[in-house]
Amino acid sequence: MPESAAAPIHLPKTSESERLKRIRHTTSHILAMAVQKLFPKAQVTIGPWIENGFYYDFDHPEPFSEKDLRLIEKEMVKIIKRKLPVIREEVTREEAERRIRALGEPYKLEILQDLEEPITIYHLGDEWWDLCAGPHVENTGEIDPKAIALESVAGAYWRGDETKAQLQRIYGTAWETPEQLAEYKRRKEEALRRDHRKVGKELGLFIFADPVGPGLPLWTPRGTVLRSTLEDFLKKEQLKRGYLPVVTPHIARVDLFKTSGHWQKYKEDMFPLMAEDAEAAAHEQGFVLKPMNCPFHIQIYKSELRSYRDLPLRLAEFGTVYRYEQSGELGGLTRVRGFTVDDSHLFVTPEQLDAEFLNVVDLILTVFRCLRLNKFKARLSFRDPKSDKYIGSDEAWSKAEAAIQRAVEQLGMEHFLGIGEAAFYGPKLDFIFEDALGREWQLGTVQVDYNLPERFDLEYVAEDNTRRRPVMIHRAPFGSLERLIGILIEEYAGDFPFWLAPEQVRLLPVGDEQRPYAERVAAQLRERGVRVSVDRSGDRLGKQIRNAETQKIPVMGIIGAKEVEHETVSIRTRAAGDVGTFALEHLIAKLTSAMAAIHGDIDWS
């Protein structure tokens, strides 16, 4: 590295840094103290640290403005500079209640009711205190006032319940050094530039419409081409590996999900029951939108008696599922209410489990490589034995977790443990992708399941003619197709690789007299599967080029009188500018070769 080059600034995650956790937690208290000093009518609720900072929720009759945030920020700096001691105090429940009632803080009183003893209070000097379990810094002077910033105000419901009071959530960020804060702001600005909601609108890929509803994207022709290209790619990979396509409906009787356990363990995330009448509703009889595809694939498995010779049976579907996300949790394509999962369920014998699991991991890694998603880590998402959110026996869980552990050890794959991250019916191997801005997203997943085969009484006839229970593998290399596309838009900043671009080539005729030849070239390219258009605007060539580059078309074909005479096309790319003039057949060969290679670039030499 040249001596003048600055080393990249590492931004630690809150979960990785005890010091940063304390800084952010204390800064949230400083925020609350500042708000109550400036706005005495504000009532406090909760204020935790989060991944990139902190927030605090307030009940205040007037909305906080941008001007208010700057005033609050200045007050926070004053508090920090006073170097107030942060003092922990243990009190009885009765004493805590007495103090809270004296302050007139109803939300804190409700929080107190759920707390177990000992009850702890943290003081900022002798002027302000909060119910809190910690941890915190010892003195506000440990926080660098130049390394904090308030960012925004958003609405939030008390305890996440839309039927309860709407609060104002002030978000802030805090770092160890001003340099880290500056780097965080730089990355945030870059994230705004890449935001898939902004870029997707500019490229005309998808829309949201109020009459349709929040969290329900509508895909335009260009966006649908992008979706279809991804689906076709995975379908071909699955075909090579012996997967069989299936299609299942969007709704089913609620009893199906009672058997699977979704109704008992996942009901809050499902859309409400569709009952024919009040009596049916009272007895929880009717239909529901499916939250997952697995119970449907199980019914296909059960439709006939299976032999060990039929296994492994690999059923695959791009199935749309529905989750009732709260409106405040929705976010573009990455958090929606209706989304498509590249779902597959493998029914295998216990002896086939390890090999099939490894084959699924190989498929996921192939997908990541082709999509150029190279920075990821594997998480062993196991159950929390202390939680009651899971179904099945301890023995089934132990066997499933052991199978995943064996696989990652056999592959020599770096991994980390995520206790409590399992699905309610089985453990998972999740692939966590880190994007260009250091943000983490869960994409591919593969799960081992002994529980649903038991709940649905699945069987196969073994070689000794006895009835045995298969094991299920759930897998989704993409995860949610909507989320994947949102991530890809931001990772590529809308500049998709050639094979994936919704519009791969745009032909730019210099004048009207060159347009007939451009149309003939386009027709020949379409016959070979190239996604091509002709600019029919009549604009000058320079404007045509600018428009194509703005719309991130990877290849532009310029056609003037010389190109018509010699039946050639002059090529310009977004990546390299002018790359030369090519005979039509030569150009077609290069483009189709690049499409077949998928993750390779076009060789223009």
Swiss-Prot record:
Gene Ontology annotations of biological process type: threonyl-tRNA aminoacylation
Top-level EC class as recorded in UniProt: ligase
Cofactor(s) required for function per UniProt: Zn(2+)
Binding annotation for Zn(2+): 294, 345, 474
Residues spanning the signal sequence: none
Substrates-to-products reaction catalysed: tRNA(Thr) + L-threonine + ATP = L-threonyl-tRNA(Thr) + AMP + diphosphate + H(+)
Entry keyword Acetylation: no
Record text on cofactor binding: Binds 1 zinc ion per subunit.
GO cellular component terms listed in the entry, alphabetical order: cytoplasm
GO molecular function: ATP binding; metal ion binding; threonine-tRNA ligase activity; tRNA binding
Swiss-Prot/TrEMBL keywords: Aminoacyl-tRNA synthetase, ATP-binding, Cytoplasm, Ligase, Metal-binding, Nucleotide-binding, Protein biosynthesis, RNA-binding, tRNA-binding, Zinc
Function field: Catalyzes the attachment of threonine to tRNA(Thr) in a two-step reaction: L-threonine is first activated by ATP to form Thr-AMP and then transferred to the acceptor end of tRNA(Thr). Also edits incorrectly charged L-seryl-tRNA(Thr).
Protein name stated in the entry: Threonine--tRNA ligase
Organism: Thermosynechococcus vestitus (strain NIES-2133 / IAM M-273 / BP-1)
Gene (name only): thrS
